[in-house]
């Protein structure tokens, strides 16, 4: 086995089925008990139930194909996000340690953008184009009240895809941070502001003001 073979094998092990399951589980946790995706998922489930039995076989097959393409997009962006987080954490540590300003939120969005990878961009574009074609076809075929339910379903998939990229990035970032601590024990302290901003960006934590506002609204 060559060195490249070992590297390929190692990369496959770093992002395996367990990581994919962890991303799905994290999303599911945020889609219930008042999580930020709860309303979107509730609307999606209600719309799927409403459409059940009301569509032709061809239309049902189109929605099934939409799900397949969207799920494949999730797979692409989560793996890419993991790699981006892994690499970006190292550069962010270097810049932060050297007191070079880092625009964290902009950096996060830029790093998970598949536009930076020709290969990933092409794969995601093909899947996105097919989803858009299916959606446009259903919009033409269905009356407005039924198509609204299709919109609820596609919105949920959009949220899942975006979260997969962000959470994949977060897992890669945390993996790199763990490695950095082995060499630089103060890495966690140096990177704490960026870590908190990243977690807030993902909806994993709230500012004190946000927590107070939520408590006051109850």
Regions found by a protein language model. Name each.
Residues 1-218:
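Intrinsic-disorder/low-complexity detector
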């Amino acid at each position: 086995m060559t060195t490249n073979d070992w590297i390929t094998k190692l990369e496959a092990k770093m992002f395996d089925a367990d990581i994919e399951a962890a991303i799905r589980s994290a999303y599911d946790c945020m889609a219930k008990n008042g999580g930020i995706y709860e309303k979107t998922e509730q609307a999606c489930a209600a719309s799927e139930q409403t459409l059940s039995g009301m569509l032709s076989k061809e239309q049902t097959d189109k929605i099934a194909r939409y799900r397949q393409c969207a799920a494949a997009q999730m797979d692409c962006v989560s793996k890419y996000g993991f790699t981006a987080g892994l690499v970006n954490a190292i550069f962010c540590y270097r810049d932060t340690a050297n007191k070079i300003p880092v625009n964290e939120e902009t950096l996060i969005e830029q790093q998970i953008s598949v536009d930076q990878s020709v290969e990933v961009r092409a794969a995601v574009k093909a899947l996105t184009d097919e989803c858009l074609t299916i959606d446009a076809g259903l919009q033409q075929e269905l009356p407005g009240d039924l198509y609204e339910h299709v919109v609820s379903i596609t919105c949920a998939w959009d949220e899942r895809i975006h979260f997969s990229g962000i959470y994949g990035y977060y897992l890669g970032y945390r993996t790199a941070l763990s490695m950095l601590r082995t060499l630089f024990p103060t890495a966690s302290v140096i990177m704490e502001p960026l870590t908190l901003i990243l977690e807030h960006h993902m909806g994993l934590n709230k500012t004190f003001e946000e927590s107070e506002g939520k408590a006051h609204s109850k």
